[in-house]
Amino acid sequence: MVAVRASRRKRASATDLYKTCKAAGTCPPDVIPKIEGSTLADKILQWSGLGIFLGGLGIGTGTGTGGRTGYIPLGGGGRPSVVDIGPTRPPIIIEPVGPTEPSIVTLVEESSIIQSGSPFPNFSGGDGFEVTTSSTTTPAVLDITPSPGTVHVTSTNIQNPLYIEPPVDIPQSGEALGHIFTSTSTAGTHSYEEIPMEVFASNTSSGSKPISSTPIPGIRRVAAPRLYSKAYQQVKVTDPNFISKPSTFITFDNPAYEPMDTTLTFSADSHVAPDPDFLDIIALHRPALTSRRGTVRFSRLGQKATLKTRSGKQIGAKVHYYHDISPIHATEEAIELQPLITSEQHSTPLFDVYADADPAPTFTFPSTTPTTIPRFSSTIFSTTSSAPLNVTIPLSTSFDIPIYNGPDIYAPVPSSTWPYIPPPPTTMSHSVVAQGGNYYLWPYIYLIHKRRRKRVPCFFSDGLAAY
């Protein structure tokens, strides 16, 4: 059995032990010298203080607070503390109150006593009011005509240049240097205001004056959003609902209406994201449409709240969510071609080429009867006139496609009833013209000697064959 060692309990501080053990005399030997300042270090400082002055430096074995007066910075003495003492107030004289006095506050004097049943005062006057009577019934008319007063009229002339009418000038005539100038009257009223105009900018200006009030140097371009920097985490969203309902990737609620061009905010503690790529998202910023590598891309920036400090600040990464809508350029699709003529159709013309006749001199040919043309003949007869005609040009002269003289060319339709006719043997004839008048040979060609490669025979038989 392994013995369990008891944990060591920490001893109380020297100050607490000194308070309890000093009176009982049970203090450890190191407590009393430390509290009373009688250790060896304290004694050394006391002995050294007999020869030098160490006051105010705070050198001791205490707590290191600099003593009672604190530390004094080097290079200057301590500044004595100044206490402002106001003027002395006069002393308040206290009047002693004897035990026989009723109260400190002076009492109110007694009022007269009103007795009930006292007689009313009797007023006796000598002369009363004088009443005057009259028998005249004429109404009294008062003359209230006001006295004539004095009227003072004051006039003041104020000159305002905005409302001064132009003076009336009589037309005058004058003569100078043989030319007669006639002035017109400036009097009268006008329904418009004549203001001298000045041309600020025109196409015929010399260019010395600026056209705009504040010319902008260079070209100012709107900075594009830097969505593909290292500060953003790139996440591709394949679900097309990210365009119309982005909140369904973060919360389980499905609102009836979501704004498309606003920033969406969410609470970090009130939901669990259905999509793990949208975990801890607290904000989805307004969308942006960009073109990236030949596609139209729908982008939104998201802010995550992964950590939260005690002060309430949320820290998280910024994520760039994007969804590729469609490619800008249409992809090439392979289209299967269908035959234009089947075995049942023979009337549809193919390879019909229309051209205008060359305005060359007209040649007249005698009328000929229809001539039977061999099947594999490549001769084509046509008539030429001054009017444009329909000229048919064959596209091939192989053995499998017959050539007919007519307005149209029809594609051959194979049939099982046709017998197989083998092609006749052909002989290739070559004709070389030695002399001609439409070209000449350059004499320098005969002076140029072609450099021949010297053959080195490897064997005796090869040398005989080479020579």
From Swiss-Prot:
Interacts with major capsid protein L1. Interacts with E2; this interaction inhibits E2 transcriptional activity but not the DNA replication function E2. Interacts with host GADD45GIP1. Interacts with host HSPA8; this interaction is required for L2 nuclear translocation. Interacts with host importins KPNB2 and KPNB3. Forms a complex with importin alpha2-beta1 heterodimers via interaction with the importin alpha2 adapter. Interacts with host DYNLT1; this interaction is essential for virus intracellular transport during entry. Minor protein of the capsid that localizes along the inner surface of the virion, within the central cavities beneath the L1 pentamers. Plays a role in capsid stabilization through interaction with the major capsid protein L1. Once the virion enters the host cell, L2 escorts the genomic DNA into the nucleus by promoting escape from the endosomal compartments and traffic through the host Golgi network. GO terms for biological process: microtubule-dependent intracellular transport of viral material towards nucleus; symbiont entry into host cell; viral penetration into host nucleus. The gene is L2. Disulfide bonds join C21-C27. It is found in: Virion; Host nucleus; Host early endosome; Host Golgi apparatus. One of its GO terms (cellular component) is host cell endosome. One of its GO terms (molecular function) is structural molecule activity. This is Minor capsid protein L2. It comes from the Viruses. Highly phosphorylated. Belongs to the papillomaviridae L2 protein family. The lineage of its organism: Viruses, Monodnaviria, Shotokuvirae, Cossaviricota, Papovaviricetes. A motif (Nuclear localization signal) lies at residues 1-12, 447-456. It comes from Human papillomavirus 69. Coiled coil: none annotated. Keywords: Capsid protein, Cytoplasmic inwards viral transport, Disulfide bond, DNA-binding, Host endosome, Host Golgi apparatus, Host nucleus, Host-virus interaction, Late protein, Microtubular inwards viral transport, Phosphoprotein, Viral penetration into host nucleus, Virion, Virus entry into host cell.
